[in-house]
């Protein structure tokens, strides 16, 4: 070839040092592909292949999503679906592999192709074509794996026969999948389902009405897991170390729609502790005579603390139910975490202790029945997220027929706004006092008087009713009201009033003042640094979106 090019004067030449024409050589890097397994050069070669008219198949599948018969959750993935489907090319469905569904095509002596559902049908068609029996050779290729997978929603149910299973389970409700196979699998199932499956009137039937696109699980640094990076986490190893419930709850609470999961084993350990908290709350109940009372009616509860927790339980039932129905599983898990850990374990249990140790048997009996009811409802709400532990606790805490998995889902409806306001006020007050003591480095054993400034009649009556609880939980020695805040007192705003803790005799005010001033300066410096960082367009464009969001949140917090 080179000699021919030179002979015809087509070669590009340059002069050498002696003035002779020599070929011009330009050094260029080329992208040479190599096979992953063989390591040899991949050379292009034209071959005969089977293709499907994907554009025709895609049209009804596009219409199904556009018209709302099939919905994506989160909805933004519809754009990815449409981008693929509206720009689709003919689909090469043949593969040169040893495994798979063999292509149903047979060739005659002159290479005429006969496509049929069986070899007998192909032979009959060939005999009609040639006018005599001939020997046929079947195509050795197999169907693309995704072509076979596209038939899954109905081929697994006995299709093409009209089986009872096909009638019952097609169409299905929800497909759960990852975004990376929306085109390869989801779109192909839509195309095949609409092409082959029809209702009694002959109308196409979609294989599912909802496509839930779950998050991609990455490592704790946000990197995609791969063997080459050495960052693959085996779920079975995590289950062995932390338990299946802890892993399941972690994945649920971190699976915000549209965001990937950065899986850190430390987070799983934290949610294992949550499971331990639920177990310990049950154990506390058993130690204090808590047991299921089939006749317990929330509406008949008299104690404010019980009516408060029943109100919070009802809110949680509503929130969790709505979140699950809208596939916001992270919000459902977060609502349960807040209710069970913060309200039941941290506060309800603490507020029940004096009742369990008291002499009022009627109050004790109500508290025991109410706590049993709250725990039972909590097990049911937690069951989709922590099935093993909740099933065990459900069976252990009462004699029951059947499994929790087969039980009724909790129903909301109870509400006592006054009780909720009162106990939530108590929680806010004690939390504020504890926080102030911690920030001021007050010794845990030290007590201080509480002076409420600007308290109205409602607050004053609440102080009187809950004086014992406030003194016990916030390490307060006495409670009084005043018109002005005393000097040297830590101040916490609670509703319309200001809670004051005179700490002059318990801490070094000069040291605390210096510490606070130093913290203010540090916060100002951090705010300025973040402000400059966030005003840098290159940082905004190139940084991890999660990092940018965290910096913005922190900057707003410092400005507030």
Segments the model singles out, each with a brief description of its role:
Residues 1, 97-100, 104-259:
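Alpha-helical recognition segments enriched in aromatics with Gly/Pro capping
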Residues 1-110, 181, 223, 229-274, ...:
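Residue patterns forming the tRNA-binding/recognition surfaces of aminoacyl-tRNA synthetases
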Residues 20-54, 268-294, 384-396, 460-498:
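Structured, non-catalytic alpha/beta "coupling" segments that mediate domain-domain communication
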Residues 66-79, 164-179, 231-236, 256-268, ...:
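Glycine- and acidic
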Residues 107, 114-117, 136, 219, ...:
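Acidic, turn-prone loop/beta-hairpin segments
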Residues 269, 395-560:
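C-terminal low-complexity, glycine/proline- and small-hydrophobic-enriched intrinsically disordered tails
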Residues 273-286, 304-316, 334-354, 398, ...:
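Core structural elements
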Residues 334-336, 365, 369, 545-553:
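Short, charged, amphipathic alpha-helical segments
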């Amino acid at each position: 070839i080179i000699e021919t090019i030179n002979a015809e004067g087509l070669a590009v030449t340059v002069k050498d040092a002696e003035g002779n024409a020599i070929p011009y050589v330009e050094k260029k890097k080329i992208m040479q592909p190599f096979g992953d397994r063989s390591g040899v050069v991949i050379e292009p070669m034209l071959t005969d292949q089977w293709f499907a008219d994907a554009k025709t198949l895609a049209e009804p599948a596009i219409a199904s999503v556009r018209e709302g018969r099939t919905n994506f959750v989160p909805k933004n993935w519809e754009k990815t679906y449409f981008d693929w489907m509206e720009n689709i090319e003919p689909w090469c469905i043949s593969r040169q592999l040893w495994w798979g569904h063999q292509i149903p095509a047979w060739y005659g002596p002159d290479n005429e192709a006969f496509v049929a559902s069986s070899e007998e049908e192909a032979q009959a068609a060939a005999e009609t074509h040639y006018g005599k029996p001939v020997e046929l050779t079947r195509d050795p290729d197999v169907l693309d794996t995704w072509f076979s997978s596209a038939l899954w929603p109905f081929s697994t149910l006995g299709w093409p026969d009209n089986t009872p299973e096909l009638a019952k389970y097609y169409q299905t409700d929800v497909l759960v999948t990852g975004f990376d196979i929306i085109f390869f699998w989801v779109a192909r199932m839509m195309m095949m389902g609409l092409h082959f499956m029809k209702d009694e009137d002959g109308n196409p039937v979609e294989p599912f009405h909802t496509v839930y696109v779950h998050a991609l699980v990455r490592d704790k640094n946000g990197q995609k897991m791969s063997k080459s990076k050495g960052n693959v986490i085996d779920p079975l190893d995590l289950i062995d170390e932390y338990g299946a419930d802890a892993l399941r709850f972690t994945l649920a609470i971190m699976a915000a729609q549209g965001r990937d999961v950065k899986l850190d084993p430390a987070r799983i350990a934290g949610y294992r502790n949550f499971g331990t908290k639920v177990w310990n709350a049950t154990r506390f109940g058993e130690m204090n005579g808590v047991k299921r009372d089939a006749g317990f009616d929330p509406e008949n509860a008299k104690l404010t603390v019980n009516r408060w927790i029943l109100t919070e339980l009802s809110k949680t039932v509503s929130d969790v139910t709505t979140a699950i129905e809208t596939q916001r599983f992270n919000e459902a898990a977060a609502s349960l975490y807040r209710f069970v850990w913060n309200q039941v374990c941290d506060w309800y249990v603490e507020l029940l202790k004096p009742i369990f140790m008291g002499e009022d048997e009627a109050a004790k009996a109500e508290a025991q029945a109410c706590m049993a009811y709250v725990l039972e409802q909590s097990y049911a709400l937690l069951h989709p997220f922590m099935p093993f532990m909740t099933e065990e606790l459900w069976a252990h805490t009462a004699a029951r027929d059947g499994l929790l998995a087969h039980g009724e889902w909790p129903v909301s409806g109870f509400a006592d706004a006054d009780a909720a306001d009162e106990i939530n006020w108590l929680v806010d007050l004690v939390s504020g006092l504890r926080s102030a003591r911690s920030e001021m480095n007050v010794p845990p054993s030290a007590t201080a008087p509480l002076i409420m400034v600007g308290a109205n009649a409602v607050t004053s009556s609440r102080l009187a009713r809950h004086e014992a609880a406030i003194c016990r939980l916030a390490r307060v020695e006495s409670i009084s009201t005043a018109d002005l805040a005393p000097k040297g007192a830590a101040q916490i705003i609670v509703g319309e009033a200001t809670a004051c803790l005179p700490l002059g005799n318990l801490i070094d005010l000069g040291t605390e003042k210096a510490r606070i001033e130093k913290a203010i300066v540090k916060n100002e410096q951090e705010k300025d640094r973040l402000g400059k960082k966030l005003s840098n367009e290159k940082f905004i464009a190139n940084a991890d979106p999660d990092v940018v969001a965290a910096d913005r949140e922190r900057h707003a917090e410092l400005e507030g």
